[in-house]
């Protein structure tokens, strides 16, 4: 896109992975950050407005953000992008494997963004990364292009290689030039044992992880000391201690405190992570909050093991107890 239209920018949601901003700097291309809706997804009205008033060449949509696990409204967003002539890249690095759950034999999950996962096939390019749900180490990701001839824009020549074929070689179109085949071989072996099937292998695993996340979220909603930010669409759950005041500063302090107390408990530690959200995104998720600072931390749990469902109630109960102790102190 930069080679054909260097004046165009790239649009991403404010919850998109931080590496998109980094690549914008590498490409020396302006990045446009778009707001999100009450479910942490790219806001469609903001997307259309940006396309109307800003020269945007590419829109990045995310199938499972790493912060909230949210799936952008991919189907509707692609339709808007086609209307304005913008190409679409889908970042399916984290949530792409949840596409396996769209099958007659797969378990049914109410509210699962089925149409958005189906629409991934309509994108111009898709990033996939088996180092997460594909059970692989780093180095086993790739980008798939609908039109393979775009490889010519990435081509770089060498005076002593690439003479064996008229087709573009991977080394000619990648930044790394050469890549070890071990990661691809390891993925092949893994998928022989755990196939890409909806009720077996990887499909069964991601289905169990989604169920674990929903179970975790259900337990949060049953406890007054904790507040769920948005129902999980993948296996990531974002939540916060119910603050003693409806302000971002109170949420930030309570989240930091609960995170540290839970992790550092010598007898019964609970390991979570913190996720920092800008004020506009967090107040959109939780309209009852007042933005008295620019951002705030919330808690984030990733249920990437099917076994997590078994312990969800116990762990959430432990977090709720610690949160109540903080409030009562």
Where are these regions (language model features)?
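Conserved PLP-enzyme active-site core in the AAT-like
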Residues: 1-155
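Short glycine/proline-enriched loop/turn "hinge" motifs that connect secondary-structure elements
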Residues: 23-25, 51, 177-181, 285, ...
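A generic structural motif
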Residues: 65, 193-196, 243-246, 304-310
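Long, low-complexity, charge-dense
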Residues: 72, 192, 207, 211, ...
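Active-site C-terminal subdomain of aminotransferase-like
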Residues: 84, 104-233, 242-245
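Conserved alpha/beta core surface patches that mediate binding of polyanionic ligands
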Residues: 165-172, 215-221, 266-289
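Conserved PLP-binding catalytic core of the aspartate aminotransferase-like
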Residues: 227-278, 283
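PLP-dependent enzyme catalytic core of the Aspartate aminotransferase-like
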Residues: 283-329
